[in-house]
A protein has these predicted regions:
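Short Ser/Thr-interspersed hydrophobic loop/turn segments at strand-loop and sheet-helix junctions
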Residues: 58, 85-90, 186-189, 205-210, ...
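A structural signal for short hydrophobic beta-strand segments in well-ordered beta-sheet cores
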Residues: 154-157
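N-terminal glycine-rich flavin-associated loop
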Residues: 97-119, 148
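Glycine-rich phosphate/pyrophosphate-binding beta-alpha loops
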Residues: 145, 170-177, 262-266
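A short, Trp-centered hydrophobic/proline-enriched beta-strand micro-motif
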Residues: 131-140, 185
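Glycine-rich beta->alpha junctions and the first turn(s) of the following alpha-helix
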Residues: 2-6, 10, 213-291
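Amphipathic, small/basic residue-rich leader segments at the start of a protein or domain
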Residues: 1-101, 119-127, 134
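A short core secondary-structure module
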Residues: 161-162, 166-215
């Protein structure tokens, strides 16, 4: 039906084999480790093991598009060619992390590739590409309709050689995860600019920065999505160096548009895979139940 490239077809075959051999047979083990872990948001041993296997087989950072292929030995796939891979990964909700293709890291890595300085890339992109750390993207807020990025209210104010952040964010994916090290935070730095698309700025806030408070975990439809999860956060006079800005003051909306587009496609493809797997499991249950 679709004419995928030879490279995409090769990865599809390899990924399907990996899922069959290493992922599907260990779903119950993953769940058992999650429930037995000391921390609800800790890094599970099975994930460490499976990531090493995926990296050895070259099933790593496959989301990186051709325009950014210089950042990886793998990937180099268009969204069209990557779509069936994302769909396959979505068949097991936690499996994208195995291949370093999990949100929000994929979008955040693209932000660093497209808009980060060489110093920012060395500090944050390199370990993200290696799967050594995780990251979060802090845009959504409780008091505004955050689907329109121009609505964000968190303030970002320059004070000497620092940015000062004050405000609240919530449903921030990965904020509680023990391997998360960096937040990309979007706020309003120039609220009186007549161009509403030039009012926003994005800055980097390392986890553990004074004034950055993780208030509580949040659920979606009753699920906490551990171990990654979602959190409510407060920024109380959080200070970071001016060099932590991405692309420049007033460029935050521009970054958001460049980041969120591909991510929405990836999410949709993964959800198609999850829906297909759910249907398959339901059909299997219907034909195999005895009571």
């Amino acid at each position: 039906m679709f004419d995928f490239s030879e490279k995409s077809r090769r990865y599809q075959h390899q990924l399907n084999a990996f899922m069959t051999q290493h992922i599907y047979p260990r779903e119950e083990e993953y769940t058992a480790q999650l429930h037995a872990a000391e921390s609800r948001y800790g890094y599970l041993p099975i994930m460490h093991e499976l990531k090493a296997k995926a990296q050895e087989q070259g099933l790593w950072n496959l989301f990186i598009p051709p325009s950014l292929a210089e950042f990886s030995d793998h990937g180099g796939l268009s969204n069209f060619d990557y779509a069936p891979l994302a769909e396959t990964m979505g068949r097991v909700l936690w499996s994208p992390e195995v291949f370093n293709c999990n949100a929000p890291d994929t979008g955040n890595m693209e932000v660093f590739m497209k808009y980060g300085t060489s110093a920012q890339q060395a500090q944050w992109l390199t370990p993200l590409l290696a799967g050594e750390i995780r990251s979060s993207y802090a845009m959504t807020e409780p008091q505004v309709a955050s689907s329109d990025a121009t609505n964000v209210e968190l303030s970002i104010v320059a004070d000497g050689d620092q940015w000062v952040l004050n405000g609240r964010k919530w449903f921030i994916t990965g904020a509680l995860y023990e391997r998360t090290r960096i937040f990309i935070v979007m706020g309003k730095s120039d609220p009186h600019n007549t161009n509403r698309h030039k009012q926003q700025t994005q800055v980097l806030v390392p986890k553990g920065t004074p004034g950055l408070q993780l208030i509580r975990p949040l659920t979606t439809l009753g699920y906490d999505d551990a171990p990654i999860g979602h959190a409510e956060m407060v920024f109380d006079n959080v200070r970071v160096p001016l060099d932590n800005v991405l692309l420049g003051a007033g460029r935050g909306f521009e970054i958001a548009q460049g980041r969120l587009g591909p991510g929405r496609i990836h999410h949709c493809m993964r959800l198609i895979g999850a829906a297909q797997r759910s249907l398959e499991l339901a059909c299997k249950r219907v034909t195999s139940r005895t009571t």
